[in-house]
């Protein structure tokens, strides 16, 4: 830095005449030569400044020097080492100086340069020059330099005599002067204070030397300097480039243009610099001409280049300005303080401080410039050689006619005809003579005005490449040459700064970029560009971009302040930290001084594209009318979708819009003259860009922009692509830092570490605070971004879009209102923080519009708005903002190679959207156009060299180890590998979106509302892994249909609260990665949905409408290439699917606790596989309206509290879905594992079936409407079977030995025919035949017809259908089903109906009792009045007890007294049970909100609660389920096929009054010893659907069941009858039903039904007899009089045809099987009665004793063996029956004794179990009562049969007998021992007697009880030892 010369800050006034100081002539000549050498000696050839080489007329003041050669080495020393710029040659044709002798003080000093030529070269410096620690010369004050020069001249150039003579002459001249020329402190004046200090009578002070006087004289002369430079030419040669940049300046003039004027502020001086004819050309490079061979010069220095040689760029005016600034100084700044004057200065110090000291000293041998000095001296001593060199120079500089003319350059830049004028006005305040002003108040004021005309620039593609290459070289070399910075120097003395005001005015600035590569070959290119540069309005006939800037005004103001390094009153001490002092002083300066400021105003800025044929398209345009085009919506997001504005839109590429700039500006909204006139635009007038910044402080630059419109036409990018492709290879990132530079210690560039610096750094503020300094603040009212994409080519093979004028999709507008952008300064010194904010953008609202081609108005479909406060709240709206930060990314690469990761944080408080179908369609077209445009525009078939190397190691070539190693070696040199990462985080508080979906019937639009809260989007790129990750999370959402009545479709199940810590409703993660070695692109998509409810309402057409709404139009997205591998993962947790029936008020909800699905889709795959795993899947239902949902820990509890009842649950479900992507698209679903559980009551199951039926009706109303006509007559036999006629045959069939398998003589099948498909049978094959089947016996022998079996008709061609493609195949491999039937009722409506009916019956009974008491007699109608049946299942009324009168005769014929007693007993029981306490149901139980938290009576009926029982009464279990379901396409005759098999089927009895365990199970073995085959299926069903017509379908059913074993307890049987006969009352529909929905849909039609024989073995235990049913003629009720054990029957093979409905099918089977059993199998049934069964078994043994010897004799004649077999059978059967009978008698005796003990001992005995209970003794309800004694109560204890837990062997029987006997004997002994004590304790007369009486029966009965039990256990153990198979059956029978 140089101090401002004093002559620039002095007054302008008429200088007085020069004092007559007479200087000797020799001194004048020597002084002139000395001054020239002193100033120019280092920069030009030194010999040219000798006196004999200078043409001068000293008397006239004229000096001229020609042909000066600039010293390149000295100039290069001043170029910073990091700058790769070097001066190769420089010449000055003529240097002229004119001194105005003798009027030196009044006339100007003129200096002129003619033809200045500088050649610079931009090239990479050598490593030696990089490592050279070249430092720039230190700062020197110009005042000190001038003083030092004068001192050197006096003390070194002159001898003592000449010096004394000069000093005396100067002193004498000053004393004799009558006027003080320095009284007003004029330039060059002496700082002598007031005028009185120097007078003619007083000599000069002793401390005033003549050196100061001479320096003042020089300064006063230079104050009148006029400088002129003409014909300046600066050339820049770029290494490896063919063109040369040539800057030409016609003239530079510097002169004083001030007039003598004085005002109140002081006197001013005005100086001006005028620069004319500035131009920049690009000229072709030319070879250097051969130079003169001079051995000595060539060996000592590089050859001098000619004027046309290549050069490097630099600022050619820097040194000229420096030359002027060095000319004059303010002498007051060089005055020495008294302390400095008193101390003699060291001469050596003076020389070292002089900036020209090196020019006076001799060069050192060791320095590089030493040889140059020797060379120069050698040439100057040889005049002949010097003359030859000068002749050669003149010959090279002056062209001859024979020389080839220089190639003409192409003009690039021109400043026009106007000059660049710089005016500087300096004003210094007047100093009064009466007082001394302070040093700081006497500040000069400088005003600088720079005026520039029109600047025009035209860049061709080659020119752009040239400049980019130069910039790349500069950037790369500047980053490489990171030379350590010098240490902070000690602060210099305080110096005042001027008050400076600088203003720059630029009239216009035009930049035209020609992007057409063929323009450079045009013949008239030079003339065209010259014409345009001369007049910018002249068009350029080549396609180009034109940038225009009008009226730029820049102003800089500095108030002038002192910025000292430390306070003036403080002197640094050795122990004081300099940094600490600097910090204190700077803070003081900021507090007390006003900062400087910079202001820039731009009138207008625009960027246009000029195409051929007069086509003009805007690119950037400032349009003040944009913000008045529409009014911003003010409604907050929660107020709906109202408030979306509209604005006019137009395509700027239309032909009719190719006018001036006004054609693309927004016209004011038309109001017309009669409507009040147009909107005033005065507020919009002014600069489009206004910049203001306060310098010297931490304030940022504030940039205010008017409304800005940016037009983005993608076709423009395509037109620019050839230019960009030619430029892109030149743009490359910087190379890694060299190792020699990395080795430099980091502390070398910092200051020295001392204890003081450490303490100072500790007290310094943290570096993060410095890193947060704001750099710029940009504000704009509105920024509009308009994007259009040209229509794609009609043919995909075409690779050109054209001019891009055609438009297919539309235009997208993005309006950003109230934009505020703040950019931070992160390039501050000190330790940088780990993360620093770079920029922050904030805006009020952003609207995104879309307009199709045919639309003239655009409507916004997306608005980013602030989060406005709720009404009534006072709060500042939260504005949307975008923050940009950077931080170093974690990497294993070296520190020099780690790039920073950019973090973009977007906070969007609210988003509003209104999406219509035309908008979606247009956006899809737009996206497709952009995608196809990218494919066309950036399609490049040529592979890069690096890409070819990557392909060698890819999966296409095998990828060997060697290729991998080579790839790893080349990896660090790949520029793309070390890339900066990016993270984008978007936070959205609220989203309010409206979807307007057209209906399928074209009746209007369906409106959907989508709302979401707390939405977060995060995108992150990992450059090292070449991976991009995207995450999306939504905490709360609501998707509803608001077309009419709002219907919620999707949303969070329970309200979102901060305390519940719930997971997001939607979480999406998308990861895309590419393997660079294999070029495999992989996409991973993970979707997690949780805590949501998806509702399916009456209409599901909206699904098709949304699918049609989002469906891309035809021809869109057809050219997208899929990724190589796509992985999709879906996870559902705590999900609910609500199914709302179309016509009923209830609903079903499906709960999903955890579901996980995964699939992989490779590129080109023929099928896709989806694997799903589920756990905790459940189904709940509610009859009416549900209550509110509350937060709970368990999802099922949430719905149960709202009134839902649990119906089904899936514990585990694993499935695999495979779908073919080609051909017919076959779908295969494999369920590998499934566990189902159904829990229901009678009413909830009926409701579920009714709701499911309602769903079925709504899905297809015309299903099964058309049925085939069936001929039905009363005499038609629908049974394709024969009844038996030969009873002898039946007897023979029952006599078949059990050693032979039972065989069906008709089919030839036996039990061995039960094979599974895995054992060799083909799927769908059936083998028939069961023992005991009713058949017809033929009289004669059967003759088999050959080929008969092959010719049988096939009902189902399974094999052919199985091979047909295009079907949907569902296969269940392993599943289990458990159905739990509960007692009680789930719906409050059912319970209320029962309670109301009970009260009604009670009232009727009370009325009847009154009538009977009044003497009236009962009739037959009383029976109907005293009973009622609800829901076809529940009986309420008088008990049908076993008395003769009530049960057999009926109520109408019984005695009035008995009837009165029965009524009284019934009413007493009802009062006892209904008068219970009140209880509060659990929260949420009920049909609606009114049912929640209501008090109900603890209602009981017959001791049973009406609510669902805690435990199930009946459990139905199916395990080992395998199912195959095939659905065939419509063109097939077979529509579907279902094959169902179950390995096990059981019905468990959990009723507490029942002692039997399994109601139904498999038969272990029949009477003939046949057992079940291994792995045989217990249940097998096949259902085939046959398609007759398009809408007609019939079913074919075949079923086969293994032999069954039944243990039927009457309580369980009655429960099942009541449960499945329950018919819920029709639910009142809350919705109006259409006429066609009220009609019942026909049931299924079975074309063919085949049921194979079913063998049964029954144990039945009756408990009640329904005499009413007997009176009605139901003979089946007779079974309740007998116990059945082992009763066998066979339900014969039946084949039916033409059956409609399942109910009719069941009724038909019952009507067919029952008569058959009665007619043909009654004997087998009766033989199962308990007493008869024993006789039958014994009789069977007797028959074997007689018949087996006979049979054996007939067979082989060995009668002994037959007798042995018969005897064994007789003995075994007889012994077993005897033991069984004895055990029963012993058990019965035990029960009688226990009852007697209870009666006599005063204690209630144990329940009598194991015996047939007679008549029920319940208080209320009889026969068919749901809650009578037949079903257990929650309070009852579970009954255990005495036949349960039988001993397995004789040994265990004896042990059990001993244990029982000892227990009872001990009890009797304890009773006897306790009697005396009880007698002693009792007092009174009868107390002891009662104790003895009560103890005696116990003492007697206990041993008897133990004895009977011991006998029973022993006999049972013996029986089980003889018959182990019976023991296994008992385990299944008893609990």
From Swiss-Prot:
Catalytic activity: a 1,2-diacyl-sn-glycero-3-phosphocholine(in) = a 1,2-diacyl-sn-glycero-3-phosphocholine(out); a 1,2-diacyl-sn-glycero-3-phospho-L-serine(in) = a 1,2-diacyl-sn-glycero-3-phospho-L-serine(out); a 1,2-diacyl-sn-glycero-3-phosphoethanolamine(in) = a 1,2-diacyl-sn-glycero-3-phosphoethanolamine(out)
Keywords for this protein: Autophagy, Endoplasmic reticulum, Lipid transport, Membrane, Protein transport, Transport
Comp. bias regions, Low complexity: 303-315
Cell compartment(s), UniProt: Preautophagosomal structure membrane; Endoplasmic reticulum membrane
Membrane topology: Peripheral membrane protein
InterPro entries: ATG2
Claim: Cytoplasm is one of the keywords in the record: no
PANTHER family: AUTOPHAGY-RELATED 2, ISOFORM A
Family: Belongs to the ATG2 family.
Name of this chain's protein: Autophagy-related protein 2
Species this chain originates from: Cryptococcus neoformans var. neoformans serotype D (strain B-3501A)
């Amino acid at each position: 830095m140089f101090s401002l010369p004093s002559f620039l800050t002095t007054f302008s006034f008429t200088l007085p005449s020069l004092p007559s100081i007479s200087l000797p002539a020799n001194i004048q000549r020597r002084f002139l030569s000395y001054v020239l050498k002193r100033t120019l000696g280092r920069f030009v050839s030194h010999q040219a400044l000798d006196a004999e080489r200078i043409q001068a007329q000293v008397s006239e003041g004229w000096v001229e020097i020609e042909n000066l050669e600039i010293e390149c080495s000295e100039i290069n020393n001043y170029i910073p080492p990091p700058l790769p710029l070097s001066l190769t040659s420089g010449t000055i044709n003529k240097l002229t100086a004119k001194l105005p002798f003798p009027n030196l003080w009044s006339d100007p000093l003129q200096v002129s340069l003619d033809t200045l030529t500088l050649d610079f070269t931009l090239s990479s410096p050598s490593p030696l020059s990089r490592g050279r620690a070249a430092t720039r010369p230190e700062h020197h004050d110009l005042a000190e330099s001038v003083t030092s020069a004068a001192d050197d001249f006096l003390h070194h150039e002159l001898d003592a005599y000449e010096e004394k003579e000069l000093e005396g002459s100067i002193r004498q001249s000053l004393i004799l002067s009558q006027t003080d020329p320095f009284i007003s402190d004029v330039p060059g004046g002496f700082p002598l204070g007031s005028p009185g200090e120097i007078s003619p009578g007083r000599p000069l002070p002793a401390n005033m030397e003549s050196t100061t006087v001479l320096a003042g004289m020089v300064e006063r002369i230079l104050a009148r300097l006029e400088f002129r430079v003409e014909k300046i030419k600066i050339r820049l040669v770029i290494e490896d480039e063919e063109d040369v940049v040539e800057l030409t300046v016609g003239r530079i003039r510097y002169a004083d243009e001030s007039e003598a004027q004085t005002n109140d502020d002081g006197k001013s001086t005005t100086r001006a610099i005028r620069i004319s004819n500035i131009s920049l050309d690009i000229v072709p490079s030319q070879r250097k001409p051969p130079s003169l061979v001079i051995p000595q010069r060539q060996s000592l220095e590089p050859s001098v280049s000619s004027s046309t040689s290549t050069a490097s760029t630099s600022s050619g005016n820097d040194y000229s300005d420096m030359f002027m600034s060095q000319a004059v100084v303010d002498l007051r700044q060089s005055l020495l303080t008294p302390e400095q004057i008193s101390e003699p200065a060291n001469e050596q110090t003076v020389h070292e401080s002089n900036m020209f000291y090196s020019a006076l000293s001799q060069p050192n041998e060791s320095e590089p410039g030493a040889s140059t000095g020797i060379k120069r001296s050698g040439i100057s001593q040889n005049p002949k050689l010097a003359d030859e060199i000068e002749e050669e120079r003149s010959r090279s500089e002056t062209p001859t006619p024979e020389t080839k003319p220089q190639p003409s350059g192409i003009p690039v830049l021109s400043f026009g005809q106007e000059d660049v004028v710089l005016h500087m006005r300096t004003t210094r305040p007047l100093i009064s003579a009466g007082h001394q002003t302070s040093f700081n108040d006497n500040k000069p004021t400088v005003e600088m005005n720079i005026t520039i005309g029109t600047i025009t620039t035209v860049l061709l593609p080659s020119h752009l490449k040239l400049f980019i290459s130069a910039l790349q070289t500069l950037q790369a070399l500047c980053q490489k040459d990171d030379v350590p910075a010098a240490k902070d120097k000690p602060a210099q003395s305080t110096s005042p700064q001027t008050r400076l005001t600088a203003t720059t005015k630029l009239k216009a600035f035009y930049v035209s970029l020609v992007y057409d590569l063929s323009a450079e070959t045009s013949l008239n290119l030079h003339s065209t560009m010259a014409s345009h540069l001369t007049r910018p309005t002249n068009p350029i006939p080549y396609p180009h971009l034109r940038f225009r800037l009008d009226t730029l005004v820049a102003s800089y103001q500095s108030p002038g302040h002192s910025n000292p390094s430390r306070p003036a009153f403080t002197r640094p001490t050795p122990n004081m930290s300099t940094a600490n002092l600097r910090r204190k002083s700077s803070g003081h300066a900021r507090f007390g001084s006003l900062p400087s400021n910079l202001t820039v105003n731009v009138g207008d800025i625009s960027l246009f594209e000029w195409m051929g044929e007069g086509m003009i398209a805007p690119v950037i345009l400032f349009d003040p009318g944009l913000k008045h085009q529409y009014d911003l919506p003010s409604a907050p997001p929660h107020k709906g979708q109202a408030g979306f504005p509209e604005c006019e839109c137009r395509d700027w590429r239309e032909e009719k819009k190719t006018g001036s700039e006004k054609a693309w500006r927004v016209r004011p909204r038309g109001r017309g003259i009669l409507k009040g006139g147009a909107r005033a635009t005065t507020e919009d007038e002014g600069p489009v860009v206004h910049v203001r910044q306060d310098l010297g402080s931490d304030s940022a630059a504030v940039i205010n922009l008017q409304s800005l419109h940016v037009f983005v036409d993608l076709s423009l990018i395509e037109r620019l692509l050839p230019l960009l492709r030619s430029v892109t290879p030149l743009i490359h990132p910087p190379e890694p830092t060299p190792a020699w530079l990395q080795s430099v210690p980091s502390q070398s560039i910092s200051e020295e570490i001392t204890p003081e610096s450490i303490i100072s750094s500790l007290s310094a503020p943290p570096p993060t605070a410095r890193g947060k300094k704001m750099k710029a603040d940009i504000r704009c009212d509105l920024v509009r971004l308009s994007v259009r994409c040209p229509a794609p080519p009609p043919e995909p093979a075409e690779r050109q879009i054209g001019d891009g004028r055609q438009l297919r999709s539309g235009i997208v507008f993005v309006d950003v209102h109230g934009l505020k952008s703040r950019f931070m300064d992160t390039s501050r010194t000190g330790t940088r923080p780990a993360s620093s904010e770079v920029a922050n953008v904030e805006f009020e609202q952003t609207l995104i519009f879309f307009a199709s081609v045919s639309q003239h108005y655009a409507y916004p479909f997306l608005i980013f708005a602030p989060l406005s406060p709720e009404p009534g709240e006072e709060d500042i709206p939260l504005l949307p903002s975008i923050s940009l930060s950077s931080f170093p990314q974690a990497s294993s690469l070296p520190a020099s190679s780690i790039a920073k990761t950019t973090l973009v944080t977007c906070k969007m408080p609210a988003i509003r959207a209104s999406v219509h179908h035309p908008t979606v369609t247009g956006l899809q077209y737009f996206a497709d156009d952009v995608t196809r445009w990218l494919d066309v525009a950036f399609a490049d078939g040529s592979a890069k060299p690096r890409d070819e190397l990557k392909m060698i190691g890819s999966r296409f070539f095998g990828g060997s180890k060697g290729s991998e190693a080579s790839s790893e070696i080349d990896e660090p040199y790949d520029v793309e590998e070390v890339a900066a990462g990016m993270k984008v985080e978007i936070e959205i508080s609220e989203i309010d979106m409206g979807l307007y979906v057209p209906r399928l019937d074209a009746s209007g639009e369906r409106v959907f509302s989508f709302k979401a809260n707390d939405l977060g989007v995060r995108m992150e790129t990992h450059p090292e892994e070449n991976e991009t990750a995207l995450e999306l999370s939504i905490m709360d959402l609501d998707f509803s249909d608001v077309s009419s009545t709002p219907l919620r479709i999707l949303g969070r199940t329970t309200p979102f609260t901060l305390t519940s810590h719930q997971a997001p409703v939607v979480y999406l993660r998308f990861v895309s990665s590419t393997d660079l070695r294999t070029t495999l692109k992989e996409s991973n998509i993970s979707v997690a949905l949780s805590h949501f409810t998806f509702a399916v309402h009456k209409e599901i057409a909206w699904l098709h409408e949304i699918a049609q709404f989002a469906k891309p139009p035809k021809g869109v997205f057809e050219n997208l290439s899929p990724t190589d591998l796509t992985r999709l993962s879906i996870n559902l947790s705590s999900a609910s699917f609500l199914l709302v029936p179309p016509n009923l008020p209830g609903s079903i909800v499906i709960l999903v606790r955890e579901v996980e699905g995964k699939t992989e889709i490779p590129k080109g795959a023929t099928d896709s596989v989806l694997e799903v795993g589920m756990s905790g899947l459940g189904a709940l239902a509610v009859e009416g309206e549900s209550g509110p949902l509350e937060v709970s820990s368990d999802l099922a509890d949430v719905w149960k509290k709202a009134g839902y009842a649990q119906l089904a649950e899936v514990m585990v479900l694993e499935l695999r879905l495979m779908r073919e992507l080609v051909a017919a698209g076959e779908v295969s679903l494999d369920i590998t594992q499934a566990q189902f559980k159904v829990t229901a009551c009678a009413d909830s199951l009926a409701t579920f079936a009714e709701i499911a039926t309602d769903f079925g009706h709504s899905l297809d109303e015309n299903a099964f409407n058309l049925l085939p006509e069936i001929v039905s007559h009363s005499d038609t036999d629908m049974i394709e079977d024969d009844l038996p006629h030969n009873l002898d045959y039946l007897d023979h069939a029952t006599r078949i030995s059990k050693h032979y398998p039972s065989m069906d003589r008709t089919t030839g099948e036996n039990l061995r025919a039960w094979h599974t498909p895995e054992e060799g049978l083909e799927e769908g094959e059936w083998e028939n035949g069961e023992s005991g089947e009713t058949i017809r016996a033929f009289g004669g022998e059967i003759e088999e017809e050959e080929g008969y079996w092959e010719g049988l008709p096939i009902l189902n061609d399974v094999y052919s259908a199985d091979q047909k493609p295009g079907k949907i195949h569902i296969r269940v491999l392993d599943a289990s089903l458990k159905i739990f039937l509960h007692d009680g009722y789930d719906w409050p409506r059912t319970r209320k109906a029962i309670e109301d009916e009970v009260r009604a019956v009670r009232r009727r009974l009370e009325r009847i009792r009154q009538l009977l008491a009044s003497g009236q007699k009962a009739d037959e109608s009383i029976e109907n009045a005293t009973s009622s049946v609800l829901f076809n299942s529940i009986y309420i009324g008088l008990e049908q007890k076993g008395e003769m009168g009530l049960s057999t005769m009926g109520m109408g014929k019984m005695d009035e007294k008995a009837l009165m007693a029965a009524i009284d007993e019934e009413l007493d029981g009802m009062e006892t049970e209904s008068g219970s306490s009140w209880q509060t149901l659990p929260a949420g139980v009920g049909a609606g909100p009114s049912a929640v938290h209501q008090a109900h009576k603890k209602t009981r009926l017959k001791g049973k609660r009406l609510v669902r029982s805690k435990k199930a009464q009946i459990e139905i279990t199916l395990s080992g389920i395998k199912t195959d379901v095939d659905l065939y396409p419509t063109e097939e005759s077979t529509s579907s096929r279902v094959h169902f098999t179950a390995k096990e089927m059981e019905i468990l009895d959990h009723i507490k009054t029942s002692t039997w365990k399994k109601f139904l199970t498999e038969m272990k073995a029949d009477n003939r010893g046949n057992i079940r085959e291994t792995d045989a299926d217990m249940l097998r069903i096949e259902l085939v659907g046959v398609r007759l017509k398009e809408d007609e379908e019939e079913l074919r059913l075949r079923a086969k069941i293994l032999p069954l074993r039944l243990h039927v307890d009457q309580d369980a049987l009655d429960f099942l009858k009541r449960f499945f006969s329950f018919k819920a009352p029709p639910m009142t529909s809350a919705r109006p039903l259409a006429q066609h929905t009220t009609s019942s849909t026909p049931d299924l039609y079975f074309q063919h039904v085949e049921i194979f024989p079913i063998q049964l073995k029954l144990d039945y235990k009756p408990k009640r007899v329904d005499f009413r049913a007997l009176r009605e003629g139901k003979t089946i009720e007779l079974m309740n009089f007998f116990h059945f054990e082992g009763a066998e029957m066979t339900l014969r093979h039946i084949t039916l045809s033409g059956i409609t409905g399942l109910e009719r099918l069941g009724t038909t089977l019952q009507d067919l099987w029952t008569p058959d059993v009665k007619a043909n199998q009654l004997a087998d049934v009766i033989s199962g009665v308990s007493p008869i069964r024993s006789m039958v078994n014994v009789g069977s043994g007797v028959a074997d004793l007689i018949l087996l010897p006979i049979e054996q004799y007939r067979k082989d004649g060995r009668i002994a063996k037959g007798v042995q077999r018969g005897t064994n059978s007789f003995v075994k059967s007889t012994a077993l029956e005897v033991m069984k009978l004895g055990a029963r008698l012993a058990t019965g005796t035990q029960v009688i004794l226990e009852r007697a003990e209870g009666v006599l001992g005063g204690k209630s005995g144990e329940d009598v179990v194991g015996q047939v209970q007679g008549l029920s003794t319940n208080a209320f309800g009889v026969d068919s009562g749901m809650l009578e004694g037949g079903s257990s109560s929650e309070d009852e204890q579970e009954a255990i049969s005495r036949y349960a837990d039988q001993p397995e062997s004789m040994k265990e029987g004896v042990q059990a007998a001993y244990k029982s006997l000892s227990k009872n004997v001990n009890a009797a002994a304890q009773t006897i021992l306790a009697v005396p004590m009880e007698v002693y304790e009792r007092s009174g007369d009868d107390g002891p007697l009662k104790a003895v009486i009560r103890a005696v029966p116990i003492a007697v009965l206990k041993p008897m009880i133990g004895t009977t039990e011991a006998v029973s256990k022993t006999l049972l153990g013996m029986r089980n030892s003889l018959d182990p198979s019976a023991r296994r059956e008992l385990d299944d029978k008893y609990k």
